[in-house]
UniProtKB/Swiss-Prot annotation:
It holds the Pfam family K_trans_C. The gene is HAK27. One of its GO terms (biological process) is potassium ion transport. Residues 86-102, 210-226, 276-310, 357-375, 456-459, 504-515 are extracellular. GO terms for molecular function: potassium ion transmembrane transporter activity. Belongs to the HAK/KUP transporter (TC 2.A.72.3) family. The chain crosses the membrane at residues 65-85, 103-123, 189-209, 227-247, 255-275, 311-331, 336-356, 376-396, 435-455, 460-480, 483-503, 516-536. This is Potassium transporter 27. It comes from Oryza sativa subsp. japonica. It is found in: Membrane. It comes from the Eukaryota. The keyword Chaperone does not apply. One of its GO terms (cellular component) is membrane.
Amino acid sequence: MGDDVLGRGSRRDQEIVLVDIVDDDDHDDVPAVRRQDSLYVDATRAGGANHRGGQEESWARTLKLAFQCVGILYGDIGTSPLFVYSSTFKDGVRHPDDLLGALSLIIYSFALFTIVKYVFIALRANDDGDGGTFALYTLISRHAKVSLIPNQQAEDELISKYNTGKPQATLRRARWMKELLETNRAVKIWLFLLTILATAMVISDAVLTPAISVLSAVGGLKEKAPNLTTDEIVWITVATLVVLFAIQRFGTDKIGYLFAPIILLWLLLIGCVGIYNTIKFDTGVLRAFNLKYIIDYFRRNKKDGWISLSGILLCFTGTEALFSDLGYFSIRSIQLSFSFGLVPSVLLAYIGQAAYLREHPEHIANTFYRSTPNVMFWPTFILAVAASIIGSQAMISCAFATISHLQTLNCFPRVKILHTSRQYSGQLYIPEVNFLLCVGACLVTIGFKTTVIIGEAHAICVVFVMIITTLLLTIVMLLVWKVSIWYVALFFIVFMSSESIYLSAVLYQFVHGEYVPVAMSVFLMIVMTVWHYVHVKRYEFELEHTVPRDKVKELLERRDIQRVPGVGLFYTDLVQGIPPVFPHLIEKIPSIHSVLIFVSIKHLPIPSVDRSERFIFRHVDKEEYKVFQCVARYGYRDPMEEAKDFVDALTENLQYYIRDVNFYTTGGDQHIFRSTSYASSIAESFASYEKHSGHAVYAEEMLTPAESFSEHTKQLSGRSKHFKQFQVENMNMQKMEKVQQEQQAILREMENGVVYILGESDIVASPHSSLLNKIIVNYIYSFLRKNCRNGEKMLSIPRSQVLKVGIAYEI
């Protein structure tokens, strides 16, 4: 082929060569493309963005974040002392030492699960600062192709935040785990189902947490107004819940600064009351730090002691919200505030209540308020209600964020998502979901009336999510982290065994109330699974029926096809090839806009994508047709822009593409820069994709692996003798004028107007498919689609500029 060696000394001391794009048959040893107008040009230009280095966080900022996260993260876990003892001893305290056994279980369960597992292990398994089971799944998705949607592209790995590290790939167990996840479809499906089960439990928890927290806090009124009936307490709680959910539409931006001081006062209060009760009633409860009392507790109570674990585990509720909201804070700030703020206060509260109950075991049903000194009752009551509302707010916000993330995976029907803060993109409000959560919380409160039964339902959500988190963390340790297999085994055995014991305890009491979160979670899982299943099937159908290249060329060259002024943005899910709805449009309306852009909105398994790396383009066939394919890439936390802002950004990046694609073209032959080592890695990516996804990548879209041109420019700018060899020879005035004319033509057509073309596919089950498939597609999915938001509303597209093209798919 006659490669010309132009220079050595890139950042990896790799050989840089100039490659002629020629037929594959002549050079089988070099991964090359048939077309230069590929998505590669923009991907490499964008991929040159610098990583945000791991800058050391100052202690001033750490302390500030530590203070702020007290209000956001610890409302739920900090209000657990309101109901733990009453949920543990449902039938009263049978033996005084049972309190020591329960306290010992609380201390060591709290330490094991919240401190060891979540604060010092799980927080490190974050996805670029984002936490939660969903983030664990996306972290795994970046290191192994586990997505059920076959839309992976090699260009995605060029994004600066798409950092897989890959030094651990040399480990045999990492390769084994990667191979297992990518080649075994059953494993992919189970991993997906576990993830959506965990997210369904988190959403269900957003119903139960407000119910149990507010009911526990309001229940304290009985101490000062004993004539209040249970029903009256319930209706006061319902009224409080309605107000709580009603104010969600306003967001917490304006009052959020009050959360941290309120929760901090709450923690100081319960800690001080705990010290007071311990000194006044029984300092002997400190013996509970001896593990012997746990053994004695189970010996004495046997089966009843095992069942009581469903109440004990409520002491670490809120840990998943803590993990999920990691994105707003740093790991060090959470570890600092948790270790020196939350842990002492909460443990002192539990110790103090145990000391009080040693003398007043008959007050077990309302331990918290009975153990509070009379002079402190009203301040405690006010802070308890405020803290329970703040803790509930954290879970509601967590549910909104979870559903927003699920939509990016196409696992949830389209719902309206509003951003309640211009400053903080993570503050969301979803009207439909908010209404359903409010109705659910009110019905649970009215139906169960007591915190004991709601606590049993709450417990199953907590333990299910913890077990799934343990499984996902184990995969992360094997696939991503470079830790000893013995540490992985120790982690899995310790946490899976202990959490399974807690799970068995809550499942034993399934009929008492646990069916509520299970029923809600099963319902949500059915909705999410059906939605995702049909989306995957539709994508596979379109991928199998993409319009062949010669057919596209034939359509574009037809003389009866009229080119009308303006720009057409043709939205499609496909990132590869032309969708089958395009020729259907031409048959019905034999005209094409002067500039036609096939736009694919693609969400990547990373939290965010820099704006400079969002768009990648390629020409569809000849340049003079002015038909492009564009992929707009977003992270799962990135909000969608308004239509006008999106078009402006697309136009700007299209101008860059036109400039770059001509800059990379030098004369009659086409050349691009290529890094030899990087070439092999991208070639491997394509081979792996074809092998494991079962879908071939079309030849005209295969990308020539290369380094970012912008990075090479930086490297070579200080080396004049080498830089002269890289100068593009034919970028003369005539070439520059051609580029400017093409750019101006695009701008003129943009001024003529933009039309958004949406393919409205009517999905029906194939007549030869199974009965289950017909029920899923023709009934469940059809119902969900008819009752969710339209595509143009989700994309914020003006209705006056929308053109819908209907087509039927049989799957």
